[in-house]
């Protein structure tokens, strides 16, 4: 489906993004690409999650066990050791104590 002028495509079991003209924005390198929220879409690569922007650039590295969509500038994230925290769209992490 088309979201923000981009469509998710799947080739050889991996996901990527194309624009409305069919031009590749992100190669099919990801296990999954979520919907865009606040200009960011979560992705999964090698079992870990991160985020790309609408230009298809990896903006937050795939280092989290799980992530949520961005809402009000923050996304909830979880680490391999089950620590939960938040990140902003620049990747700045906020961890609870």
State each model region's role.
Residues 1-97:
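Residue-level detector of conserved, function-critical positions
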């Amino acid at each position: 489906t088309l979201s923000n002028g981009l469509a998710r495509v799947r080739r050889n079991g991996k996901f990527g993004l194309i624009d409305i003209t069919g031009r590749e924005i992100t190669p099919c390198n990801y296990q999954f690409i979520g919907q865009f929220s606040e200009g960011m879409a979560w992705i999964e690569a090698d079992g870990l999650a991160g985020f790309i922007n609408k230009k298809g650039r990896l903006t937050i590295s795939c280092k989290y066990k799980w992530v949520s969509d961005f809402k009000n500038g923050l996304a909830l994230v979880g680490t391999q050791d089950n620590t939960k925290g938040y990140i902003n769209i620049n990747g700045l992490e906020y961890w609870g104590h």
